């Protein structure tokens, strides 16, 4: 268990950009400060997607929303990049197929020695363009992507890159192959 690393100031360095991230961060700090990390398993799921999400409405995954948008409109709208490090559509996310999320969760639930905080993702950042092209190919449609300005209200909070470090769950013996966007 990687508890000793978390006892250091490592957790102090993070600056969450939204309330959800802040609540996760505060829980992690509390668990660390109370000496609970070796007795709990905390899971941080990265962009989970999969079938049958329609009932979640606006809370469904971005993958589900993009699929519906392309299916209904034959095109997809993406935010322009507002930083020089990323071109339009090159913003990145770690997309995790729901079947992988379930397998990872069950693995940790069944592993009596697991303890601490785990990132659950595929461990590989993919671009919004990768996502768009995978969906267009699945629907057998020619790509039609429109870029629009990102609303001012979210520009300073927008994450241009997320990628789960899944080395910790791999160290517990989890060795399953993970779905790629193109295969899920």
Predicted regions located by residue number:
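Catalytic helix-loop patch of NAD(P)-dependent Rossmann-fold dehydrogenases
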Residues: 1-49, 53-54, 58
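Short secondary-structure boundary/capping segments
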Residues: 5, 11, 67-68, 109
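Hydrophobic alpha-helix immediately C-terminal to the catalytic Tyr-X-X-X-Lys motif of short-chain
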Residues: 26-30, 34, 62-66, 131, ...
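Conserved alpha-helical elements of sugar-nucleotide-dependent glycosyltransferases
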Residues: 58, 62, 127
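Generic alpha-helical secondary structure signal
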Residues: 61, 65, 161-164
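C-terminal substrate-binding subdomain of Rossmann-fold SDR/epimerase-dehydratase oxidoreductases
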Residues: 70-184
């Amino acid at each position: 268990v990687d508890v000793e690393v978390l006892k250091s100031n490592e957790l102090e360095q993070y600056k969450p950009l939204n309330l959800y991230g802040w609540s996760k961060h505060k829980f992690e700090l509390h668990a660390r400060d109370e000496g609970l990390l070796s007795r709990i398993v905390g899971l941080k799921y990265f962009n989970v997607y999969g079938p049958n999400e329609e009932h979640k409405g606006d809370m469904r995954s971005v993958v589900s929303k993009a699929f519906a948008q392309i299916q209904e409109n034959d095109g997809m709208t993406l935010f322009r990049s507002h930083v020089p490090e990323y071109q339009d559509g090159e913003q990145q996310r770690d997309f995790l197929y729901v079947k992988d999320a379930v397998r990872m969760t069950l693995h940790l639930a069944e592993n009596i020695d697991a303890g601490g905080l785990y990132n659950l993702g595929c461990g590989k950042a993919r671009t919004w363009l990768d996502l768009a092209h995978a969906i267009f190919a699945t629907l057998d449609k020619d790509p039609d992507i429109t870029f629009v300005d990102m609303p001012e209200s979210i520009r300073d909070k927008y994450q241009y890159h997320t990628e789960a470090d899944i080395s910790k769950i791999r160290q517990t013996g989890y060795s399953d192959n993970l779905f790629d966007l193109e295969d899920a």
